[in-house]
C-alpha cells in the first residue's frame, strides 16, 4: 500500500494553535492535522491527526467510514458506546489502541474530563 505523506522531522506541535471541528462532529471535538491529506471523494490518501475532546462533550450516533483508522489514546478519559444522551458506555484510559477496517461502526464517544487521541486514517489504494 503506497503511503504519500510529506517528510517531517521532529518539530514542536503547537497544541494551543488552530484546532478545527471536523465535518459531522459536534462543537467541542476538534482536530489538528499533523501530516497528509485524505480525499474522501476520490478515496485516496492518508492523514495523521490529533483529535481533542473538551470535557463533557459527546457524540450521539456511531461513525462508519470507508477508510482504515488507527487510534491511540494519548491522555484523558474516553467512553465508548454511550447513548444519544451521553449516558452509559465503557470507559478507557490513556495508552489504549484501536484498529478499524473500513465499514466498521464505532462509537458514540464521550469524554468526562477531556481527552486527546492520535489517529491515522488511510485508504488501501491497492484495491
Model-derived segments and spans:
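Short acidic-glycine-tyrosine-enriched beta hairpin
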Residues: 82-103
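Glycine- and acidic-residue-biased ligand/ion/polar-headgroup-sensing regions
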Residues: 55-59, 64-84
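Ligand-binding loop in jelly-roll beta-barrel domains
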Residues: 91, 102-126
